[in-house]
Amino acid sequence: MKTLLALVIMLIGLTVVFAQNEQAPLQEKEIKYKDWTYKSVRDDKDINLRKFAKGKKLVLVVYFAPWCPNWKHEAPFAQKLYEKYKANGFDVIGVGEYDTVAAMKTNLDDKKITFSVVYESESRDSKQKTLHYDYRQTTGDTRGWGSPWNIFLEPTKLKKKGDTLTEKTFVVNGELIETDVEKFVREKLGLPAEENKAATSANKTIEICEPETKPTTFKKPELRD
């Protein structure tokens, strides 16, 4: 009986752990974020970030792994922001990580993503070799894979030359909290505040981002006379 009770308690504990969400607050952090030139997922052409940001008011760079359930939840909101504010000087660019380019293309099609997407790595084995990983260590992101990870850039404040674009900016070490981020975006674009909306996702339960994780199956012990 004690063994069965212990198993029940352990299952409850696992449920709590795996029911966490990975939303995080928008915070200004010191980070030496570097300029980059990566290949486009869609056509393999080079995209340089400094050139991409030029002439815009605000750019969201979102790093993601296509297999990550947490990215599944953020992708529609990132697309919504892009569509809603691109005419106001806002843009989004995704940086794919830890999977094949083919898998990234499929993911973009499935999620109906239309903003620009490049890739830094193509394998999960590259995890600790990426700039994405280095940036997360700098900003205190302790998650296993860090997908999604978001950084906002204000092009008028970026350095015009050199490897480093900025040394201080706003980041989100997790999923975007929709109401907070949209308020931030509107402020940076010089748009009036919208009426307060109920948080659509602040308390929702989502999956933790871990690749190929299979739940442990427990068998009920047989009772013998």
Regions found by a protein language model. Give the residues of each.
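Positively charged n-region of N-terminal signal peptides that target proteins for export
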Residues: 1-5
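Bacterial N-terminal signal peptides
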Residues: 6-15
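Hydrophobic beta-strand anchors of alpha/beta hydrolase catalytic cores
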Residues: 60-61, 92, 150
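Conserved segment of the thioredoxin-like fold in thiol-based oxidoreductases
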Residues: 83-130
